[in-house]
Amino acid sequence: MATEVNTLELTRDLLSFNTINPPGQERQCAQYLGKLLEDGGFKVAYYDFDESRTSLIARLEGRHDKPPICFSGHLDTVPLGAESWSKDPFSGEVDGNRVYGRGASDMKAGIAAMVGSALRLQKNFPEKAGITLIFTAGEETGSQGASCLAGLNQVLGQCGALVVGEPTSNYPLVGHKGSLWLEIETTGITAH
């Protein structure tokens, strides 16, 4: 059972997967993480909202009835952009104290940190609350993976605390911006 990972090496491995969205193609990256987490004792389930657009949920049951700590992030990245890169965007090249690659900060290093933390928690505190990792596809173009999971009955479950690894200029936050879609219908007399 694997219980430790080198977070930098895991970041570099994740950067080697081209998950630029569109088209996304997160399945291989999700399966790579799923295997690592299964080896660490987690139960892993995969959810596709489209072909090769795979999200995953990995769970480690706790030893009591408290809700688990949950970690969440996304597997896809934004496009490379018009400017050419000085380093291969899929190499995970390390230069000094920086690692370069598409998605390094948003958010493959965050996912590597979450996986490393979850595996350490599992190893060092096995009798405590459970751990759930939720890694979604399609965040960069409308959060389709998260919407898919939210639409499935009783897939996500409860969480005692949620850690979202989106970059926030290295400041821990208790809240973060998001989006909300509303449809409102009113009746009455039109006037101004």
Per-range role (PLM):
Residues 1-81:
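N-terminal helical capping/dimerization or prosegment-like subdomains
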Residues 107-181, 185:
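Acidic/histidine-rich catalytic neighborhood of metal-dependent amide-processing enzymes
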Residues 66-132:
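Active-site metal-coordination/substrate-binding segment of hydrolases
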Residues 47-50, 103-107, 138:
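Active-site nucleophile and cofactor-binding loops and adjacent substrate-binding regions
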Residues 69-71, 163, 189:
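Residue-level marker for buried hydrophobic side chains located in beta-strands
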Residues 11-14, 93-98, 186-192:
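A short small-residue
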Residues 1-2, 45, 183-191:
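Metal-dependent amide/peptide-bond hydrolase catalytic core
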